[in-house]
């Protein structure tokens, strides 16, 4: 009898629905490159989001708005390759960048297809409420699963007046609930709820058949998602209220690089153990080499093309 555990089942849109029905929590994180994807997959995440949050976490922008569709395709393809190095279990979702789906349904379908065909994503995520119902229907009819995203939608940061909690009063809470129902009806297979009151997230989750993935939405969602850089503690100066830092990698990286710099300055690195050796290397005096070089014809290094 084999002692190896059975391979873990790939998490697709149907498995996510089953997890909701079974009461199994969904663990999702962001990743932006192959190395991060390989590591989070090995850690056992159920889903990976190639978020346009890379604009802030990787590119150094103040918002997600400058991120382009080409960049999303590029990073998604890297993450797909990283996941392929593991057991291939995690579900891969890519964000649709600002401007890639708002102008027309036709453009949205083309953008979604690129993220799947070129970026290797299994699904796309887009922000917005009922007003994007027709766009979602078109993308789904084209064969691309869509994850919705309501509450705080970072691509609408200027309209919302900043990164603030949404749905705190009765009227806005009702609108979020209406949007959630509309997105489910439009064909979304899952829904991200960002920065809304925990009580509202519980109501939305209980009234939908599709899974809800919370970020800053309390413990009642069917799953949770965090930006990898935040949960790893890579930036000690930025820790939103809803983020729990599960590591302090920022300090660890600074310490490791600082140790490297110190050893280089002290000529302690590289030492003998980190150097290559050969007893058969033929040493040529520098002076002799220079003389031989002067005797070579001018075209010895190759004629210009």
Curated annotation (Swiss-Prot):
Mg(2+) binds at residues 52, 95, 127. Its main location: cytoplasm. The keyword Metal-binding applies. Its cofactor is Mg(2+). InterPro entries: Pantoate_hydroxy_MeTrfase, Pyrv/PenolPyrv_kinase-like_dom, Pyrv_kinase-like_dom_sf. It is an enzyme of class 2 (transferase). GO terms for cellular component: cytoplasm. Binds 1 Mg(2+) ion per subunit. One of its GO terms (biological process) is pantothenate biosynthetic process. Catalyzes the reversible reaction in which hydroxymethyl group from 5,10-methylenetetrahydrofolate is transferred onto alpha-ketoisovalerate to form ketopantoate. Belongs to the PanB family. This is 3-methyl-2-oxobutanoate hydroxymethyltransferase. It comes from Anaeromyxobacter dehalogenans (strain 2CP-C). The gene is panB.
